């Protein structure tokens, strides 16, 4: 077990410790990580400092997201996610749930909105889906009661509008659920068919894990190798994949697959395979947690990383 992987486990453990439902897992993981770090490696000053920095950062990031800081009535930030009746807004420090049914804003738009911070509370659906827990696990602890919103810089691609235009071509909920899951890494858990697929783990395997995306990339590598070298084939496959990446640039599964693919190429051709697969996974995992610690609670994170490690 590499030291980088132990650092990765420590980061994951710290985030798990912040949630009541995963607290026990956090204890187990961090004890496992620290014991292995103590037994396998010399605990020099550098190692201790790195561990302290990682633990401090993870907990600080969590508490900044949870506590109320710099409350005002006007906020500038970016739209991280857009749904039918709400969007997720990020002001650089915290993410907010914003109820919204309009069509003037889309994902990755830079906006200024006026509103007041409030606590949110949603009823649990009959299917057992708890939207409150869903938002909290995404690092969203407050909502903004929207009074006004202005788009400062609109992103060139309207992701939500494009997705809706594609899904509108399908008549049944079953078709929309499958296409939405495969093309856009989205799934409607309120749909009976969706729940059936969820039970069978088909969606988790093909959509959340990104297995089919890796299959696409490496299949075309093999096809291009009939004509080109290995390196050129891998680059061409990535170029061919670029349109899919663009329309899913806000989806973790797609970003994770591309990041692993590109890092593997860089490690192979520029660093002469200096980093092992385990170390590459650890480095990217730590980077993802630094960007958004709450990604640890998503199925896409632990399922995709588990498959990658295996």
Question: What are these model-predicted stretches?
Answer:
Residues 1-67, 239, 254-257, 266, ...:
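N-terminal leader/targeting segments
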Residues 8-12, 250-310:
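Internal transmembrane alpha-helical bundles of multi-pass membrane proteins
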Residues 68-84:
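Structural detector for short beta-strands of small beta-barrel domains
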Residues 77-80, 106-125:
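Flexible glycine-rich surface loops and low-complexity tracts that mediate binding to linear polymers
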Residues 86-91:
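SH3/SH3-like beta-barrel fold
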Residues 92-105:
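Beta-strand/loop nucleic-acid-binding surfaces
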């Amino acid at each position: 077990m590499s030291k980088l992987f132990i650092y990765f486990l420590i980061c994951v453990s710290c985030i798990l410790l912040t949630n009541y439902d995963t607290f026990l897992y956090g204890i187990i993981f961090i004890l496992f990580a620290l014991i292995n770090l103590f037994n396998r490696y010399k605990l020099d000053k550098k190692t201790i400092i790195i561990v302290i920095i990682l633990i401090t950062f993870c907990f600080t990031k969590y508490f900044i997201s949870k506590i109320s800081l710099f409350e005002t009535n006007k906020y500038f930030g970016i739209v991280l996610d857009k749904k039918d009746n709400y969007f997720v807004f990020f002001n650089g420090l915290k993410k907010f749930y914003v109820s919204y049914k309009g069509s003037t804003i889309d994902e990755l738009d830079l906006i200024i909105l006026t509103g007041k911070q409030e606590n949110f509370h949603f009823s649990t659906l009959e299917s057992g889906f708890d939207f409150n827990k869903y938002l909290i696990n995404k690092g969203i602890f407050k909502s903004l009661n929207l009074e006004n919103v202005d788009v400062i810089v609109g992103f060139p691609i309207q992701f939500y509008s494009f997705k809706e235009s594609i899904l509108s071509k399908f008549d049944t909920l079953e078709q929309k659920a499958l296409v939405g899951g495969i093309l856009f890494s989205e799934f409607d858990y309120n749909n009976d068919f969706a729940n059936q697929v969820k039970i069978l783990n088909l969606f988790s395997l093909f959509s959340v894990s990104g297995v089919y995306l890796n299959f696409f990339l490496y299949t075309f590598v093999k096809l291009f190798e009939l004509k080109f070298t290995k390196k050129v084939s891998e680059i061409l496959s990535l170029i061919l994949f670029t349109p899919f990446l663009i329309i899913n640039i806000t989806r973790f599964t797609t970003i994770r697959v591309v990041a692993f693919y590109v890092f593997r190429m860089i490690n192979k051709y520029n660093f002469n395979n200096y980093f092992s697969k385990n170390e590459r996974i650890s480095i990217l995992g730590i980077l993802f947690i630094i960007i958004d610690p709450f990604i640890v609670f998503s199925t896409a994170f632990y399922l995709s990383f588990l498959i990658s490690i295996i």
